[in-house]
């Protein structure tokens, strides 16, 4: 996966501190974000939340996806509705790079717009946190004044992902390899939080940066 270094190094230059949190899947991004929220009472904007919002509430997006993949990705427990089964959708996009790119091209403009809307709402906040798993891949670094990478070892990443989502190793592998490698993200980030072990050991690193 190629990422433009010039785009990856773009940063927000305004007075508001915008902490962009990224990292690999199951690296602990959300946990670190929640910790910052608890100690700093800082607004949190989450790309995954905006993505879920689009898949559940945006009828145009839902219709577009269903028209492409058919009713195989509609929730089987509620087949009369147009509720998208995210697990079924994941099985498609994590096994086919072209389908993943198609879905990202569909969702990323929606997610970007939601970030811009929420940033405008919180423009008077001195600090705000943006949790964006595909921060570099989606070229969203321009939204952030600084980028923190939440890092963990590959073995730990596999273990957490398999346990969290009930995946086998092959399924976890497809998901991990769909993202830019953590080692590449380290080079493009401003700060690195090592979250390989217990979260309690990561919090002091966060405190130093805050």
UniProtKB/Swiss-Prot annotation:
Entry's EC annotation: 2.7.1.24
Entry-linked SUPFAM superfamilies: P-loop containing nucleoside triphosphate hydrolases (SSF52540)
One GO MF term: ATP binding
UniProt KW keywords: ATP-binding, Coenzyme A biosynthesis, Cytoplasm, Kinase, Nucleotide-binding, Transferase
GO BP annotation list: coenzyme A biosynthetic process
Span of domain DPCK: 18-210
Matching Pfam families: CoaE (PF01121)
Keyword Transferase among UniProt keywords: yes
EC class: transferase
Residues reported to bind ATP: 26-31
Keyword set includes Transferase: yes
CDD domains: DPCK
PROSITE patterns (alphabetical): DPCK
One Gene Ontology term, aspect cellular component: cytoplasm
Family: Belongs to the CoaE family.
Protein name: Dephospho-CoA kinase
Organism the protein comes from: Prochlorococcus marinus (strain SARG / CCMP1375 / SS120)
UniProt gene name: coaE
């Amino acid at each position: 996966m190629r990422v433009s270094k010039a785009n990856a190094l773009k940063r927000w230059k305004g007075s508001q501190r915008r902490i962009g949190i990224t990292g690999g899947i199951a690296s602990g991004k959300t946990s670190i974000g929640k910790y910052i929220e608890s100690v700093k009472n800082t607004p949190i904007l989450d790309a995954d939340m905006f993505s879920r919002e689009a898949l559940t509430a945006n009828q145009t997006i839902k219709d577009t996806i269903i028209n492409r993949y058919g009713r195989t990705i509609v929730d089987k427990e509620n087949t009369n509705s147009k509720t998208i089964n995210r697990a079924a959708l994941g099985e498609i996009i994590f096994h086919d790079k072209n389908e993943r790119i198609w879905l990202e091209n569909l969702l990323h403009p929606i997610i970007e717009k939601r970030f811009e809307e929420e940033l405008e709402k919180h423009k008077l906040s001195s600090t705000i946190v943006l949790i964006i798993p595909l921060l570099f891949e989606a070229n969203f670094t321009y939204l952030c004044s600084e980028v923190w990478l939440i890092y963990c070892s590959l073995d730990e990443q596999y273990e957490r992902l398999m346990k969290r989502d009930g995946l086998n190793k092959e399924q976890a592998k497809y998901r991990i390899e769909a993202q830019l490698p953590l080692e590449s993200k380290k080079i493009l980030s401003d700060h690195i939080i090592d979250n390989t072990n217990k979260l309690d050991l990561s919090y002091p690193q966060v405190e130093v940066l805050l």
